[in-house]
Every structure is written in structure tokens, then in C-alpha cells.
Amino acid sequence: APSGFMGMR
């Protein structure tokens, strides 16, 4: 999954 997924948290 893209880093954006973790960045959203």
C-alpha cells in the first residue's frame, strides 16, 4: 500500500 495510507493516520 502507498505511504499515503499511513500518512492519513
UniProtKB/Swiss-Prot annotation:
Coiled-coil boundaries: none
Work out whether the entry's keyword set contains Secreted. Answer: yes
Keyword Signal on entry: no
Annotated positions of the Arginine amide modification: 9
Taxonomic source organism: Rhyparobia maderae
Q: Which GO terms describe its cellular component?
A: extracellular region
UniProt name for this protein: Tachykinin-related peptide 4
Q: In which tissues is it expressed?
A: Midgut.
